């Protein structure tokens, strides 16, 4: 039985999705300020590993727990919604099916409490 990670296209596809997501974040007036001063290469590596893991890929994420990573950022529902929107669009642009995109966004939504540090 294939996993969501496999259906999406594995590591190369997740890397492409994250690259597309970062382009969208950089031009989003709500999100771009949150990432000002962030080492985006390091953030990319963490996000690729995190998404790969929650999409049933290899356990790669070795960063701090999400709530600790996001502590002090004052992330709110509009931030989460914007990231989710951009992630869904990035997946569509990279050819991920609507069904797999929905499954991926459901998994990200399951992490919302930790992402928003709530």
Curated annotation (Swiss-Prot):
Q: Which Pfam families match?
A: Bac_globin
GO cellular component terms, alphabetically, are: membrane
Its required cofactor(s), as named, are: heme
User: At which positions is heme bound?
Assistant: 70
Compartments (UniProt record): Membrane
Question: Mind telling me which InterPro entries this protein's record contains?
Answer: Globin-like_sf, Globin/Proto, Globin_bac-like_CS, Hemoglobin_trunc, Hemoglobin_trunc_I
Chief localisation class: membrane
* S-S pairs: none
Q: Which molecular-function annotation in GO is an example for this chain?
A: heme binding
Source domain of life is Bacteria
Cofactor note text: Binds 1 heme group per subunit.
What membrane topology is given? Answer: Peripheral membrane protein
Task: List UniProt keywords, sorted A-Z.
Answer: Heme, Iron, Membrane, Metal-binding, Oxygen transport, Transport
Answer yes or no on keyword Metal-binding.
yes
* Record CDD domains: TrHb1_N
Q: How does it assemble?
A: Monomer.
Task: Give the UniProt family note.
Answer: Belongs to the truncated hemoglobin family. Group I subfamily.
Its name, as the record gives it, is Group 1 truncated hemoglobin GlbN
């Amino acid at each position: 039985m294939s996993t969501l990670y496999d259906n999406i296209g594995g590591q190369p596809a997740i890397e492409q999705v994250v690259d597309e997501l970062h382009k969208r974040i950089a031009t989003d007036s709500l999100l771009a300020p949150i990432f000002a001063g962030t080492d985006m290469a390091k953030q990319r590596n963490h996000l690729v590993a995190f998404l790969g893991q929650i999409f049933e890929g290899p356990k790669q994420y070795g960063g701090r727990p999400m709530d600790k990573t996001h502590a002090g950022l004052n992330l709110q529902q509009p931030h989460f919604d914007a990231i989710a929107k951009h992630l869904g669009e990035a997946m569509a642009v990279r050819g991920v099916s609507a069904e797999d995109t929905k499954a991926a966004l459901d998994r990200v939504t399951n992490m919302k409490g930790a992402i928003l540090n709530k």
